Every structure is written in structure tokens, then in C-alpha cells.
A protein has these predicted regions:
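Membrane-proximal alpha-helical anchors
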Residues: 1-44
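An amphipathic alpha-helical interaction surface
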Residues: 42-124
């Protein structure tokens, strides 16, 4: 069952990675890296993409809570949160959409953001 959970997570990551390679998403990522303003359409596209990314992370959180995700995989996910939230746009989107997530996931994400802001990106 654990192997199946891990495979499902890997499949989900692969789908998100492929979605992140689509032209419209790549264009938005480039604009974000260059600190360029996004159009309303680009904001909408990226909001959807980032929301899906967080839903996948919420699923990982759930899998960990029920014992289906091992500690190594969980630790990797927590570290990746710190990288994910280095992008100011991600923080902006999170503040906007976090009310749509489970309370314990919101607490987890907010704590990871707080830790990375206090201790820097290398804290785990």
C-alpha cells in the first residue's frame, strides 16, 4: 500500500511537471523570474496551476497523516515547501486560496513559510 501511495504521488508530480512545461505556464514563470507584471489572464492561468500544485501537496500531507508516506518522502516534501515559497507570487496566491484547504494543512504550510522567513531557506 505504501508503494502504491508513493507511486501515485510520483505520477501526480509527473503530471504537474508536464503541465508546468506548457508554453503559457513557462511564459508566466519567466515573467515571474524577471519580476514582470502579469496580465489578468496570466494571473488566472498561474493561480490554477499553483492551486493544483498545492492540492497535490495537501494529498501528500494526508498520505503522511494516515501512515502511507514514509518519513524520508515527507521530509523531502517539507524542504521543497521552503523552495516553493521563495517566490513572492506563491505567497500572494497562498494567502488568497488558503481558506480552501484543510485547517491542518494551512497550519503546516504557514509554519513552513514562517520557519523559512525566520531561519532562512536551509532550515528543515
Amino acid at each position: 500500500a505504501r508503494a502504491n501511495a508513493r507511486q501515485n504521488i510520483a505520477d501526480s508530480h509527473q503530471k504537474l511537471a508536464l503541465a508546468g512545461m506548457k508554453k503559457d505556464i513557462v511564459a508566466v514563470k519567466i515573467k515571474l523570474r524577471n519580476n514582470e507584471e502579469l496580465s489578468k489572464e496570466e494571473n488566472s492561468i498561474y493561480l490554477t496551476y499553483f492551486s493544483l500544485m498545492l492540492r497535490a501537496r495537501e494529498n501528500q500531507h494526508y498520505q503522511h497523516k494516515i501512515g502511507m508516506l514514509d518519513e524520508d518522502e515527507w521530509s523531502s516534501m517539507l524542504i521543497s515547501f521552503k523552495t516553493l515559497f521563495k517566490e513572492p507570487k506563491h505567497l500572494e496566491i497562498w494567502e488568497y486560496i488558503k481558506i480552501t484547504f484543510s485547517e491542518d494543512f494551512v497550519e503546516l504550510v504557514d509554519e513552513q513559510i514562517r520557519q523559512s522567513q525566520i531561519y532562512g531557506q536551509d532550515s528543515a
